[in-house]
Amino acid sequence: MDKLKGLINGLILVGMLSSAQSPATATTAPQKPVLQSLNEPQTPATHRTLSIKGYKTLSGTKILFIRTPGLPMFDALVSFAAGSAHTPHNPGLAAVTYSLLNEGVAGKDVNAIQATFDNLGARMDMGISQDRIWISLRSLSDESRRTPALELFAQVLGKPLLPQESLPTVKSQLQYFLDHEEQSHAAQAQIANLGQLFPDHGYAQSLYGTRAGLTAITRTQVQDFHREAYAAGNAQITLVGDLTEEEAQRIGAQISAALPLGPATAAIQPVTSPAAPGLLRIERPSTQAYLRLAQPSVLQNSPDYVGLQMAMRIFTNRLTHELRERRGLTYHVDADLSALQAQGLLTIKLQTRPEQADAVLAHIKTMFSDFLAQGPTQQELEDSQQRLAGSAPLNSATNMQILRQLHAISAHNLPLDLDFATQAALKLNLISIKTALNRHYHADQWRAVILGPKTDQQPLPAPGESATNAMCRVPGEIVAS
């Protein structure tokens, strides 16, 4: 089990869990596999036509299933609308509840749970975001291994002890995450930018809560939140692997029946009054400046989402060519859409030299204004579509990749087709992309953050002038010139 590794993934802080519940902000080395047959072989990807089956239990649990009989194994992922943005008035409650889930069930503590899964050749993983939490199980399909693994998995989900004795440890670990978050320039720039877009909203809070909020949380609050947010009506189950349709239905019903009875939680409300466009400067000692620009966008199930996503791929390529390749001002720049469920978000982020942060910000705004006015070129669109068509089979090469896509389809109410977004993107034309861009974005609506040292500003170097002083990548968050 992987437990609470604090990660920043685009606009969503994701916590991955390990059995010891030990926090880290960097990816840890892969563990030695407990069972070789659970490792999917690295074979060249080929396109697979995969049929999605959908069901719903009487208690309201949504189930999606894809059969992949190539390997004698399966993956189950259970997701709840129980992320940090669901508890804005009790900061940290979602993270504390999530962290206590596998601390014990009847007759087993956290170590015994881990040992049982290991002995069965199974693996449990967990994750949390602002919107949702998820818990997954990978197991062999053989019934003698599958049955006890699923029984324990369902017990962890539906009847965790949420022990009082583990509460101080969990709070301490989340406090550690908050400490690290405050020391991370990238995290602070992100939180500040989210605060501009989502003032007084759960999305603007740290995934881990606040110090005062964590201190105040009681076991009774945790138990109440588990009973409400981890209810069958608030659950979504995705299954992928070597199972028959009857077995998948039975597994889904088994997991759903183990959960508390209850309806779906209230949806997170979208932001109605974001802060006015503008620039927020945060002075911090650093060898670089952290830049973030954001403005409202569309939800993932919007008809325009695919076109805007393609547009941002193209614009990212333009930014990379201009800022990295021609001027040597950054190692990496990215323009991307968020996967938040209540409010879409377009974000551009990069790191650059402090003395040229203002000039870089102005240049990005000018480039985006030109992009809105002119749209992409035919060559840019064809190149992006060709790359997408070539990489699409890689997205369904393994069960885990399929599971991730299936989870996104379930969470965002997307069409029941793994190829839907790819096929829609391949049908895009210049007019549809430019129309979508100008329908949703404005050149003067950026909320921007520059975090870094105060210094005299310099103009942009001419293309090619900074080749010998270009930004370079070194370990950690350090990007030196």
Where are the predicted features?
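M16 family metallopeptidases and their MPP-like homologs
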Residues: I66, L71-T97, V110-L157, Q175, ...
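Hydrophobic helical h-region of N-terminal Sec-dependent signal peptides
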Residues: N9-L13, L17
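His/Glu-rich zincin catalytic helix
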Residues: S22-T116, L120, Q223-R326, R447-S481
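A common structural junction motif
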Residues: F153-L162, I255-P263, T366-G375, S466-T468, ...
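Histidine-acidic residue clusters that define the catalytic metal-binding segment
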Residues: V34-K53, Q196-A235, A267-V271, A392, ...
